[in-house]
A protein has these predicted regions:
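Secondary-structure end/capping motifs
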Residues: 31-112
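Conserved C-terminal helix/tail region of periplasmic/extracytoplasmic solute-binding proteins
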Residues: 102-139
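Short secondary-structure boundary/hinge segments and terminal tails
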Residues: 16-18, 80-81, 121-123
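A residue-level marker of the well-folded mature domains of exported/periplasmic proteins
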Residues: 2, 17-18, 65
Length: 139
């Protein structure tokens, strides 16, 4: 318990795949301007690597955007958000998207029967991964 807050549940410890974050765009953009999408995904992947490799820099950026200089709060946020939840290879999986759709089904019943693959395109990240680009970021 820090700063008077109690952790009720560590979602990551449950081992349930879940798409916590993602990049959203119209599907048409991935067809009309794939280079733009590729550049954005590349920059996002580089930013993740920088945050994971350079804690001092990441804490400075987080402090600016979270509008706090509290070192304990920033360190805890870094450990949870960057080290625990940010994936080195930011891939969404069918299982993770299925969990999201199952959650949505209470409000949007047709989500339960939707095909998870319809909602994400992992080809850009997979290209970065297969080219060795992501591994090179961590060397």
């Amino acid at each position: 318990m820090k700063l008077g807050h109690r952790s009720l549940l560590d979602v990551a410890s449950l081992g349930i795949p879940y798409a916590f974050t993602g990049i959203t765009t119209r599907g048409r953009l991935t067809h009309d301007d794939p280079d733009l999408v590729r550049r954005y995904v590349t920059a996002q992947t580089e930013a993740i690597a920088r945050a994971k490799r350079d804690k001092t820099f990441a804490l400075k950026v987080m402090g600016k955007y979270l509008r706090t200089a509290n070192p304990a709060a920033l360190a805890e946020s870094y450990d949870i958000d960057v080290q625990k939840y940010m994936l080195k290879v930011p891939l969404t999986t069918v299982e993770a998207m299925r969990s999201v759709l199952d959650d949505l089904a209470a409000r949007i019943p047709k989500a339960k029967d939707s095909e998870p693959r319809k909602f994400f395109d992992d080809s850009f990240v997979r290209q970065l991964q297969s080219s060795g680009f992501i591994d090179a970021l961590y060397r």
